[in-house]
Amino acid sequence: MSTSLLTNLAAVAVILSKTDQLARVATFQSPESSADEREEALTDLLSANVRLAHKVAKQHVRNGLDFQDLLAQACEGIIHAASKFKLDSKASFTTYAKQWMRARCQEHVQANA
């Protein structure tokens, strides 16, 4: 994921309600959605959660690891969460995605320690 894309997402971060996030996840997961619809849904999810990704990445910066690499890993966690999230889950998408953001960052730290 490019640094400029992450910077642009942070600049235009939007707030999506739980219902709106679920709708974006449903669009992203739906085989009936076009590639453009899936891309737009994913962009909205990334934009709505990029500040949380920033926070998670910042918590893992140590030993000279590049913050941008960690931020990219956190965003990969959002993408993974969007593909695996169960729409009937009682947990919010953000809560679920945060687990995957942390996991991706921890894997990156371990691989590059």
Residue ranges of model-derived segments:
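Alpha-helical promoter-recognition and RNA polymerase-docking modules of transcription initiation factors
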Residues: 2-113
